[in-house]
Structures are given as structure tokens and as C-alpha cells.
Amino acid sequence: MQGRPNGASGDPNPRNDTSVTIDSDSDNGSRHRIAEVRGSSPSQIVPEKATILNDKVKAGPCLSTEKDLGIRKQLALSHTESIIASNPIAVMPLESPKQRLAMESSTESHRLRRARTRNPWICSGLVLFVTVSALLILSIIVYSYQSLQVDPQGCRTPSMRPTYIKLVGFDSEHTRFASKYGLYLYRERGVDEYSEEDIGIKGVPVLFLPGNAGSYKQGRSLASEASLYFHDVLQYHQERLKTGVRGLDFFMADFNEDMAAFHGQTLLDQAEYVNDALAYILSLYHDPRRPGRDLNLPDPTSVILIGHSMGGIVARTVLTMSNYQTNSVNTIITMSTPHARPPVSFDSDLVHTYKQVNNYWREAYSQKWANNNPLWHVTLISIAGGGGDTIVPSDYTSLSSLVPETHGFTVFTTTIPNVWTGMDHLSIAWCDSFRKVIIRSLFDVIDVRRSSQTKQRADRMSVFKKWYLTGMEVSAERKLPRKEHTTLLTLGDDTKSKSILRQDEKLTLRGFGHRKGPKSHLMPIPPRGGVPEKKLTLLTDQKLNSMETNRKLDVLFCSDFPLRAGQSATLPSLNLDLSGGSASSIRLVCKSAAEDVISLPTSTSSSKFAFDNVPSLSYLQYDLEDLTEYQFVVVIDKAETRYPGWLHAEFSDSSDSVIPTRVGLGRLLSAGLNIRLPAERPMVIDIKVPALHSSLLAYKLHVESKDCDGTELFKPMVRQYISGPYESKFFVNVRDAEINLHGIAPYMPPHIGDNAAATGISFQLWSDASCNGPLQLSLKVDVLGSMGKLAMRYRTVFAAFPLLVVSLVLRQQFKVYNQTGIFISFMQALDLCIRSSIPLLFLGLTFLASSLATSKNTLSKSASPNAGSNSTESVIDFSANDLLLGSQDAFFWFLVPLFGIISIGTCVIVNYVAMILIHALGAIRAILMSRKGYIKHDERGNTSIFWSLSTKNRVINTAVLLLFVATFIPYQFAYVVACVVQLVTCVQASWHARETRSASHSSFYNYVHSIFILMIWILPINVLVLIVWIHDLAVHWLTPFSSNHNVFSILPFMLLVETLTCGTMIPRITTHLRHITYVLFFFLAAYSAIYGVTYAYLLHHITNLVIAWLVGIHFFAGGFSLRNLSRVINDSDGVPNGSPITDGHIKKLP
């Protein structure tokens, strides 16, 4: 039999009655225990007195009959009366005497205690229902994320023959990171000439920066293409060489696969190293002994930076460092780089570094004068892979809150001509079609005749827009108005060599070369000033660009000759006579439209994807105001023999070609959007849907068209696009299309200019109107497909919101414990919270999310007229979307309760996983201990039943660990150690609770188990930094982190864990001080929901504060004294209020 006597708290009006409650376990007759000894006089059972009862009990074997039980009762009563009379010592000074007597002297209290100590595995029906709902929602999200609304990818793997030359001269004399990082030069075998004496530095320097845990070898795809393209093409173009084009020398930074995405100090170290590398690279070109040096060209003063993933952030950080050489960087291209926000917010240094770097760039571009802007000559291009990138949300690649359109932009790979495919996080560094565009754009911006090695900023931006944008954007530049007349066209009066269309007549050509010799088709340009405005659209399957030498078609814009006053009188260099010697002829002076040609994917009956490896279409689009100085659009068929192909051109009214919609999101959800286009319609139609701008929703588009009676020129094609950032997706041969976008996303900072994404999505439709059939479009919200969009946008929420639930559960456990003395299980407390505090808190958070979204919309609308001016940049609150859901749309209020349900289910799953782990380890422990046969529990109640280490050894171990934290190891390592120790404590507590069937041991186990669950949810915040530290050890980098050695960030955790290893239960508090515990846990819960996503690193520190308060309760519940401190350290029984276990019988393990 196990006795559990407990002294009563001091009562100013003592009563002369003593009650004894006997609790027998009917399931196991060998286990009986005295539950309580209650008396009015203050008392405490001392260990020496407790052994008297145990000695009497141990006189024979374990008793199981009623007679034996009666003997035990008599022994207990007589012994208890003697103890009560001789031990007037109060146990809990913070406990209310009246409340204790009221709770402990009633039969109802005993029933409550029995109910409170039920099996921790038991799950109530309500908790089970919520958990099943959470699992169902999570399953839908995962299925949708992996299988629905997934963008197709069409990257082809390139081939290369790499050689990496390590620059050993870049040693510790040049940088303090020489032993940790490295610098390489890429050479293509069989193409680049190099030797040990001459490594072949003759071109423009480019430095590739890998991303998080990335290798410098990821830059080989770009470097190989640069070598091959210059070797095979450019070196034979003398005109290009005269304009300053040279080869590219690709250098690569080796960061030893360091993890800058998890640690801010690592990011700063890499940026410092890159600046040292830039200085060294430029010094190689300044060496007068360098072979092949051209004395007629200036030495380079800048290096082009290309960054992948976090390498792009390193590139931007370079310009903010103290060792940065002014103007050593003026061009930065980044791929899948999270510019707007850090990928995770678990490290304070990383969050602060992001904030400082972004503020620097915003401040620089907010300056009114160029002289005050250190980034005036810098161009920054951010390229995103789209939905296929499952590492970095492509929303984070946006530059809209950092850089004005004059200095940079964000574009998606699905937008880039002749790429037209989404990419994942890794393939964007090697995709064959994409790398070709990158390299060709770099060759177009370099100019070795300038010391900067690049063209002026405006010219660079023009080149990048030409290569990376579709050419149909509002900001797209048209080269035609700025060009000189290049062709003098002479036409005869015969109809065989030319045809002149009527005003507003459409031109359709099916096949070319129907006659010998060229034939011209003249489309009169309508006079300007009409309402509505008109625009020209021309589409053909023939090549029209200037790089095509054997073109079958030419498109010219012509005026009468001689020119009118005010126009250039320079005679054209090309004379094209199609008159056939006719006496009466028409002479026109013309400009070619070849430089304004837009490439579009081919759309035929066999087309599947835009990135199919087939020749593209050529498209021209001009507003009428761009054609005011011309009279004719002339299409010249130059094919000498019959040649298959087609062309369609027309002038259309904007009222017919642009269809605005005013449908709201609510109506779109209920009824969808249906548009019927008539048979007589323009070839190109723009459908604008401003209500669709959120990146959280996905849609389904259905296009239904009538089969063409004759030969169809092309199948319907749809371009889905938004303007901020530049994201376009092409759907060829379209019938059904999955629509998703990267528009307004959660937690994104406001734009520094007009928010183009807020204008919504648009659909540009190309259809063959010659089929004379109507066309039906249907757009509906894809609810199931939209669920998967939550995974990437709110992935940190799934770590922050569960901490809210755990905090409320612990708060409920302490409330019940302070009232009854029983620390209920995690599942019991969760059941109570679901019935009380959790719904109320999530309801309040829902109203808060709606009000925040409404207020943000109001403020953004009121500030929008001045948003673009530099003078108002400082008033923009770039942290406006950091709270809660991070959304400006009140429509998504339902996400708060949705995440609440998921969080509850996640906590239940983690709780059961932890319990399975604890019981599995306990079973292993039992097996190991069973080899020793019988185990004798120490008869002394103040000896630890958990750990065999002495107090002195525990103090020494803790002090040594704290010393290491202060000097060498990060506190995150100590936290992981604390989690392991707490796990072992849970295993010990669980084993003793099962073996003794004691309510006190059950309470202690529930307490340490809940603390362990709390620590588990903080563990991911600390593990990532620990991974960085372990990686540094692996590469023999022993320099300690500067910001992760705060002893006070781990001291409360270590003290609490060490205290719990002694088996000491936290004292009850029934005074007003108990409300501090409740407030602290509620504050942790509220912060987890409101700021947990943006500032997740603070969750550790707030939890640390809560733990410090619990440590204070352990140490100073009876007032500050060395005696209380010694009691906590040496107490070992795990019984509440420091009462010892008096069961000293010998027991054999099962």
C-alpha cells in the first residue's frame, strides 16, 4: 500500500477534525493507497515519520484481502493522528486555506480528482471531431498543392564540358574568409583557351553567387552558354565587336554550401566576402602583365552579378556593406530570389538584415536628385520560376516595394519570349531555353569601351525589357517611331504586283509565292482622331524579325515621297522597285517593323504547351497614335515559289477589342463569369477582370468555339497576364485552362508606386474570326485548386498557430491545477479549451483580421494618388501587412478559424506522437531494467527517483553548458539538449505514473509532458540556426556567432528542465499572482497568431519569459530563501507541494 499524506495549509480558525480518504484500485488488488490525510492543523509529513507506516506495511507481502485492507486503515489512522499532533508546519504559503479546505473536505472534490486523473490517451468526442476535420482539411490542402493547379514545366537539360580554376591567389591577405569560402573561374573545355600561366581573362567579368546550401557549380550552365555563344557566333560579327561586345569571364563564388537563408550573420559574411572578391577580380584586369590586355580599352571598374536564390540577396547586400567599392556593381540579375521578405523568420539577424538592406534600397530610390542616390546607375532584374518553385514563394521575388520601374522589374519565366515555361527552384539555374535568353541579354548590355563594361542604365533597361517582357505591356517601347526611313519603295500601277485594300478592310493571306516576283499588299491607315480609338494587330506564322536573313515576308510602314516638311530628308539606304518598269509608279519611303516583332507560341490542333519545340508566331501591335506619320501598312510577299503559311492583319476599334467586366468575387463564386463573343469580332480581344487579383485563389477557364468550316489559320490562344509583377501565361489550342496568378499576396509590403496587381487579371484572346462562328468563355473559381495555394503562402502559419493552441492548453491546465491541485492531461485541457477559450480567441482574431484588412484598404486608397512621388515614399508603412493573415482583403476572414481547426488537429497529432515516443522509450527502459530483477525504491522521500546524479554534478553540468553557450556554442544547441533532457524526464515520469498509479505522479507527468509539447513547437525556430553552426564546424570554421550567445535566452529553460529532473512539481498558486501565469500564456498565444509569421524568432524569447516565470514559482513560492532553493533542487519525488512519496515497498517490474 502506498500512503500519500499531505499537510493542510494554515487556517486561522483550526478545527479539531481529521478526515482520511482511502482509495483502492479495484483493477489490481495488490495496489492500494491512502489518498489524503486532511486536518485543520498545519502539518507536514517528514521522511523519518513516514517510514514508520511503511515498515508496518512491509511486514508481510502485498495485501489484497478486505481484512488486510482494514488493518492498513487502522495503521494509517493511528499514525496520521500522531503526525498531525506533532507537525504544525505549513506547506504552501501561496495557497488559500479556505479554498484548500473547501476543495479537500468534500466527497465531490474527491470525485473531481478521480475524474481529473483519467487516462491521458483518452480523447473526447469533440476533440476527435475537430482532429478528423483538421486531417481532412490538411489532406485536401496537400492533395491540391501536389496535384491541382500545377504549372507544366518544359525545361531541356543542356550539355557542357566544365573546367573550374580555383584562384588560389585570393587568400587570407585579401579576405578573412579565405579558409571558409573560395573563388573559381569557369573555362569551357575545347572552347576557352587557358593555361597555368594564362587563365584566359580577356572579357567582361561576371560573378555568379549560389543560393542557400548551393554549389558554385550551379553557374556552369550559364557560363558554358556564354563561352559557346561567343565562340560560335559573336566573334565572327565584326559589327557587334565594334560596338564593344566581348566574351564573358564567369567567376563563381564558392560559399561551401553555407545556409544564408537561415542565418543573418552568414548572409553578412557572404556579402563581405563578395566585396573582397570583387576587388580581387578587378585587380586581375588591372595587372599590366596580363596577357592579351588591350591598351586601347579602359580597365574594368565594375562586375556583373548573377545570383540564384539567396545569392541574389547577397548581391543586394553587397552594395550596403562598408567594404563596398563605389560603382563596382551596376547590373544585378537574380533568379528565384526572395527580395521582399525573408524565406523564414526564425532568426533575428536575418529579419533585421533584410529590413536594413531593403530600407537602404528604398531610401536610395526615394531621393529626388541622382547625386544623392548611390544606386542611381544600378539595374536590378528579378526573375521568378512561378508556381513550380516549392522552395521560395514566387510572390517574394517582387521588387515592387523596393525598386522603381526605371531601375528594375520582376518577371516570370512564363512571360519570357521563347521560354514560356514555369521552373522549379533548381531548374531555373540550368534550363536550356532560359539560359540562352539570359546570356544573349548580357551580351546586349556589355560595352568594353566604357570602364563600367556596360551600357548606360536606360539602355540596359531597354535591352532587358526587350528580352524578358512580351512586348505587349503598356510600358513596352516601340522602336518604329524613333527609326529612320530605311527603304524607298516603288510600286507600279498594275494589280498583279500590288493590291490596295479598302479602309478598315482586313488582310488575310493563305500561302505565299502565288506569282513570280514580289507582291505588295497595302492597308490604308485610318485617320487619327476617331472615336473610339483603333489599333493595328498583325499575326503570321512567318519570321519577321531583323535577325532572319531569308524572310518570306516584310512588313513596312510607309509614307509618301518626297517627305513632308519636318521629317527627315535622309535618303533611304535600300531601294526596292516593284513597279516592273511601269511609267506611272508610286514612290513610298518606309520603315521596317522588324525590331518591334513580338514572338508568340504556336497554336495549332496538335499544340499542347506554349513551350513546345516548334517555330513561334510573329505578332505586331500598334496603337493608332504610333502610326500618325504613315499612310500605309505594306506587306510584301517575297516568296519566289509557293510556300505554305498565313498572315492576318486588321484595324479594330478599342470598344470591340477591350471588354471590361464588373463582376465581383462573390458573384464569381456563385455563378461564375460567362462571356459570349460574336462571330464578327476582332482577332485579338482583351477581357479585363479587376476583381481577380489575389494569389490565394485559382480558377478554371473554359473556351468553347465552333469548328471552322474552311481551313483554320490557328486555334484559339489565351494569354493570362498581370502587370505588377510581369506575369504572363500562354495557353495554346485552348479549351480548358487552369488559372492561377501571383498578384496580391499575404505579408507582402506595399508597392512604392501604383499597384498594378490591384488592377486585376486580364485575358488576351487570339482567335481566327474567319471561321465565322461565335466563341464562348466561362470562368469559375476552382475551390479545391485554391486550397493548395495556402501551403506556400501560409506555410509559417502552420508553425505559429499551433503554439497558440498549446499556450491556451497550458493556461487551462494551470487554472485547473491552481483550483484543484490536479494537473490535468493535455487532452483534457484541450477539450476544455475547445469548449471555452479557443473559440472566443479565434472569433476575436477573425474580427481583428477583417478590421485590419478594411483599414488597410481605406488607407491605401487614400494614399494612392501620391504613392508614386518620391516625396511621399517615407510615409508608406512597409510593415502594414505583417499582422495576422497579412492580407488586405477582408474576403479571407474565414482563414482564421480554418487555421485554428488545423492547428488543433496538428497539436493533437503531435501530442500523440510525443506520447508514443515517450511510452516506446519507457518500454525500452523497462526491458533494460528488468534484467536487474527486483528494484527497491529508496525509502527516503527526498531522494531522486529520476536521476542518479548528485546536486553538485547537476549544477556543474549546467554551469559548464552555460559557459560554452557564452563563449562557443549557440544557445540553440543548449535548447536542443534541454529538449532531450525533458524527453527523458517525461519517460521517467510516465513510467512512475504507470507503476505507482498515484494521482500525484500523474499530475507531475502531465505537467512535464505539456512543457515538453511547448518546447517541441519552439524547436524548429532553434534547429535551423543550429544546422548552420554544425555546417560551419564541418568546414572547420570555428568563429562563433556574434548574436547567438545570450545566456539569458536559454537560462530559464535549463533551470526549469533541471528542476523537473528532480521530480519536483510546481507549487499551486491560489492568490492573485496566479493571474500572471494566465496572462503570460495568453500573451504568448496572442503574439503567436498576430506576429508569429513575420517575427517567429520572438516566439522563443516570449516562451523563455513564460518559462522564467514558472522557474520563479518553483524557486520562490514560499518566499526567497536558500532553503526553498535547496528544497527545489533536492526534492525528488514528483509529488505536488513537495510532499514525499512514502511507498518503500519492493516491487518487481512486469
Curated annotation (Swiss-Prot):
Membrane topology: Multi-pass membrane protein
Sugar-bearing residue positions: 16, 28, 818, 870, 942, 1124, 1130
PROSITE patterns the UniProt entry points to: LIPASE_SER
Entry's Gene Ontology cellular component terms: endoplasmic reticulum membrane
Localization annotation: Endoplasmic reticulum membrane
Intrachain S-S bonds: none
Main location as per UniProt: endoplasmic reticulum
Entry EC no(s): 3.1.-.-
Record key words, sorted: Endoplasmic reticulum, Glycoprotein, Hydrolase, Membrane, Protein transport, Transmembrane, Transmembrane helix, Transport
Region (Disordered): 1-43
Active site residues of this protein: 309
MF term (GO), any: phosphatidylinositol deacylase activity
Cited function: Involved in inositol deacylation of GPI-anchored proteins which plays important roles in the quality control and ER-associated degradation of GPI-anchored proteins.
Protein name per the record: GPI inositol-deacylase
Organism of derivation: Coccidioides immitis (strain RS)
